[in-house]
Amino acid sequence: MQIIRHSEQTLKTALISKNPVLVSQYEKLDAGEQRLMNEAFQPASDLFGPITLHSPSDWITSHPEAPQDFEQFFSDPYRKTPSPDKRSVYIQAIGSLGNTRIISEEYIKWLTGYCKAYFYGLRVKLLEPVPVSATRCSFRVNENTQNLQIHAGDILKFLKKKKPEDAFCIVGITMIDLYPRDSWNFVFGQASLTDGVGIFSFARYGSDFYSMRYEGKVKKLKKTSSSDYSIFNNYYIPEITSVLLLRSCKTLTHEIGHIFGLRHCQWLACLMQGSNHLEESDRRPLNLCPICLRKLQCAVGFSIVERYKALVRWIDDESSGTPGATPEHSREGNGNLPKPVEAFKEWKEWIIKCLAVLQK
């Protein structure tokens, strides 16, 4: 195992900058917010720790990238920021996300509520779910895993056409595996920062995906034409467990973070670290390090205290926490299902520690 440990001065500069304008901006932050963010360069901090690499296949080792400090983020000419008339994040479900209509709709509401808390201050809106056939995307059966896959690039084109006028971004979510091109095995997600669109799959987050008993294998792809989507009528969907919900929330917020202009984090253990495989993704925390937190706060303009309180409320709320957020047709049928948040309890304790620092 390798530990990436930066010096106090390096972390301080990455967070605050040496640019007098950005230093002044930092000094105008709430005293509690400065106190929390200063934990970034406190060696004894129990809130923010160094990045640990466990194998040569981990992201930082296999995908060398230049780090992005706050000043580089702030000065990025290609970075998009929400404006008063484009301040909504739209979520588009593609295909069913649960084994019943109620489970699918509740799961979407849980994800929506989480995004509302994570990107506190932005509007998060649901679009009516669409079947795979509506996207007109290419698809295949993966030769190695024998599971169905849809073409990520085709989905991005579909989402770009559907993007509402008031959207900062539109993100597609699906339980069907993705591939970006014929030569690739799979991809967890793909986004276009310039177009403000992204597509993310949670298919590989089920507990059985990598097991011999995985039920999503398709023996042979039978289609009469490229427009025959009947194979998706009963595709396999894993059970929505607490771990799958946690993994989904991580991926969704990580990828939307990229649309805000946050690059992969190389400073401290952080949600914005890259991940090359599921084990590495599971190691990533749900939280942003102070450097990435300052970036997101700069882009969105939230109070850190209120954001953390909203996240605690989402964990504590047994139902969706997003009243009125579901499409009209979904209000028929039985009520809310219990939200499986067991996997989030440790993170809740961490947030409460942060709130104690913020509210001293």
Curated annotation (Swiss-Prot):
SUPFAM superfamilies: Metalloproteases ('zincins'), catalytic domain. Its EC number is 3.4.-.-. It holds the Pfam family Peptidase_M54. Zn(2+) 1 binds at H254, H258, H264. CDD domains: Peptidase_M54 (cd11375). The active site is at E255. It is an enzyme of class 3 (hydrolase). InterPro entries: Archaemetzincin, MetalloPept_cat_dom_sf, Pept_M54_archaemetzincn. Binds 2 Zn(2+) ions per subunit. One is catalytic, whereas the other seems to have a structural role. Disulfide bonds: none annotated. Keywords: Hydrolase, Metal-binding, Metalloprotease, Protease, Zinc. One of its GO terms (molecular function) is metal ion binding. Zn(2+) 2 binds at C265, C270, C289, C292. It comes from the Eukaryota. Its cofactor is Zn(2+). GO terms for biological process: proteolysis. PANTHER family: ARCHAEMETZINCIN-2 (PTHR32205:SF5), ARCHAEMETZINCIN-2-RELATED (PTHR32205). Belongs to the peptidase M54 family. Probable zinc metalloprotease. This is Archaemetzincin-2.
